[in-house]
Amino acid sequence: MENVITNNNKGLPKSILKFIPEPIQPLFENPFFSAGFGLIGVGSILAMGRKGFQQAMIQSRRYFFVSVEVPSKDKSFHWLMEWLATKKNKNTRHVSVETTFHQHESGDIVSRINFVPSVGTHYVFYRGRVIKVERSREKNVIDMNSGNLWESITLTTLGTGRQVFQNLIEEAKEMALEKEEGKTLIYTSMGTDWRRFGHPRRKRPISSVILDKGKSELIIQDVKKFLNNSDWYNDRGIPYRRGYLLYGPPGTGKSSFITALAGELQLSICILNLAGKSVSDTSLNQLLATAPQRSIILLEDIDSAIQTGNHDLSAKSNSANAPSISSGGLQYQGYYGNPSVSSGGSALTFSGLLNALDGVAASEGRILFMTTNHLEKLDKVLIRPGRVDLQIEIGLCSSYQMEQMFLKFYPTDFDLAKQFVEKLENYKFSPAQLQAYFMTYSNNSIEAINNLNELIKK
């Protein structure tokens, strides 16, 4: 009996001990040590098995599943969010709320609440396939361009081809563009990125902005010619970009015409504020290079952003006439030298602006419009050909404009329109002044003629 008990308390069998070096065999003959060794061995085997299973799952996912990640910085992220909002899944328990705005033809703006998948994992069906949707958000990472937390959406499905995702994103894009059809999109600069500003606006009819005879047609035809002749520019090695300057007194319709032009040619408008604190030489180049396709880049009131003092371009600058930057924008007082940055001002230099417009790194495929109330304040180097290719004066109303504006409000009163022009032939008014006057007598053309003294006194 004792022999049996002793043999049962032995460690590893001799058939296994013979493979272990003799100096450490006594350790394995100890039953407690051998039991611990066995547990370690079993644990190691289980750990290896688990790791192998994980690797097998990773490999199988690589071979049998296809995924695509869409970061929040990309436009398609917002297309996908709108598309997912249309997928009514009753089983989805965790959603986020997004409010969008829509403008009716009447001009009324209504809000709409969309429920989109919140952060986490969700499933949707698309063309007979199950799509796994993983929305993630980095709590400590902020997109410096938008100021929002960094997000991404990862789509995963069974298969090896990416065509399903291409079709899905294309469908989401078409759905988003359909909502914008017939609208003018406005973008504003944010850091080095463009962000949508407000809601899409109804297109403004080009006929609603009355310029002097022939000027509207001239600009429209010039922009159309540019848009349709990219090959002509490339074949001749000419940079494919076009610059326009509209100058004239306030209230003459410069910005209004650009808005109507964008609607007429189905273009977006990108408003660039040069006096912004975040605008630098580098960010300006980035903004011009990444502007949305088929868009007008608008520099409004360029004279306010760039205040030019009296200086001799042929003279070398010194500390007294070196260009500097004020909190109101870029103040240029000399042609040579580099501007210095004052606290609270823009980090943009005058030379940086010139290089961004037509330097080596200047972007192509670009339509740039500048407006100014004071042409005399602009430096000639800024508006020379190559930077500004067409300058158009948008002045106070001519007789033609007065008559056309009268007929716009009173379409059938041709005789009264001529009387209106004759009575005001010795006076000058801006279109904004005339429009405000006509709106006072919007339904009575006779009163509009009889009360002209009100307009003249103003």
From Swiss-Prot:
The gene is bcsl1b. Residues 1-26 are mitochondrial intermembrane. This is Probable mitochondrial chaperone BCS1-B. ATP binds at residues 248-255. Keywords: ATP-binding, Chaperone, Hydrolase, Membrane, Mitochondrion, Mitochondrion inner membrane, Nucleotide-binding, Transmembrane, Transmembrane helix. The keyword ATP-binding applies. It catalyses: ATP + H2O = ADP + phosphate + H(+). Its main location: mitochondrion. Chaperone necessary for the assembly of mitochondrial respiratory chain complex III. One of its GO terms (cellular component) is mitochondrion. Residues 48-458 are mitochondrial matrix. GO terms for biological process: chaperone-mediated protein complex assembly; mitochondrial respiratory chain complex III assembly; protein insertion into mitochondrial inner membrane from matrix. Belongs to the AAA ATPase family. BCS1 subfamily. Its EC number is 3.6.1.-. It is a single-pass membrane protein. One of its GO terms (molecular function) is ATP hydrolysis activity. It comes from Dictyostelium discoideum. Pfam families: AAA, AAA_lid_BCS1, BCS1_N. It is found in: Mitochondrion inner membrane. The chain crosses the membrane at residues 27-47. The keyword Protease does not apply.
